[in-house]
């Protein structure tokens, strides 16, 4: 039992800074929305529309680079720190290639926005302007993620927390300058949010670059030592590990986006209640997501040390801690659901709808914790292809179809509206949790030589 307690402490020490870093990123989006909304409702809506296109694109790149964390953790655990710099340099090349692809997609996103049904032309122009501004921050964001993944692979999660918080503080005055046109800058409104956020991503990268070159714990990792040409074999391996994770993230983000579109014809009350419940559950999701990052680090590090048993302890401990936290957040959600809904909106009908959906949100928090932490464990084992197949099956073949049938049709029961889609979320996330758990169990039953060879690949 003692080893599980020690492992739990290590996991929480890694996870807490990740939570704070994620909150900083979320708060940056909230600040953009509030400050754009102070100009006009059109500017706020333009930021929302632009973000709905930007987020899946940049998260795809983010997911692709997550392969670096277990790679660095495994090299660190096995005492091969001299190989880390080369992996990170190739991570930069991969980030550069992906950022170019993302910028091309975002630059041409005006075709998507202009074809949206009944979209206001002014709103469309502002949304396109927002995207054309923020896309220049794509390389900065992904370069920052490369160095953040290096630090996290070395069990250093605090730098990402500190720099994320500084990024939030920097974002506010830059927003102020470009949204309202201060100090000689043009008043860009919602487009200014894109300029500010893109700038902040580069600032965060430069701060992280400054940290890794001066941190005593990383003096032996010489990133700046000469020019490193692309190593296509390493890039292919990193891309092969990261692509399933990137696609899994893309499936998850687009699932919620599609459900939002399907709910939109059901009326203002349904849409508002759905959005409130989804926003709050997304905040609660940050806790197990941070444990997922910690699980990847700990499992990868233990496998690097050649200890399959310790990796198993790290995996089970992370899931157990996640379940305990999920029980707390689920109880909190059930008890205070009406009070939480009132913080968002005072309309009685909306509060009733949101409160009802939060009951379902509380129900799926347990399975959500298992599936997201399970995904982190599998990343630690470098078993990322299974993550892709599990998420695709659970979300798109089980969750979304069942939600659609329950929410909008009378085939099974009378159409349930938003509640039907949330039951679909429960089905999808529970299916993912079961499949993740089964995959982890299967993997841990394999011979130690097989597990270690897979992790060392």
UniProtKB/Swiss-Prot annotation:
Pfam families: MatE (PF01554)
Keyword terms, alphabetized: Antiport, Cell inner membrane, Cell membrane, Ion transport, Membrane, Sodium, Sodium transport, Transmembrane, Transmembrane helix, Transport
Keyword Magnesium: no
Any Gene Ontology biological process: xenobiotic transmembrane transport
Alphabetical list of InterPro entries matching this protein: MATE_fam (IPR002528), MATE_MdtK (IPR050222), MdtK-like (IPR048279), Multidrug-R_MdtK (IPR022913)
A cellular component term, taken from the record's GO annotations: plasma membrane
Function in brief: Multidrug efflux pump that functions probably as a Na(+)/drug antiporter.
Source organism of this protein record: Yersinia enterocolitica serotype O:8 / biotype 1B (strain NCTC 13174 / 8081)
Entry GO MF terms: antiporter activity; xenobiotic transmembrane transporter activity
Protein name: Multidrug resistance protein MdtK
Family per similarity comment: Belongs to the multi antimicrobial extrusion (MATE) (TC 2.A.66.1) family. MdtK subfamily.
Annotated TM spans: 11-31, 46-66, 93-113, 127-147, 160-180, 188-208, 243-263, 278-300, 316-336, 350-370, 387-407, 418-438
Compartment(s) where it occurs, according to its Swiss-Prot or TrEMBL record: Cell inner membrane
Protein's membrane topology: Multi-pass membrane protein
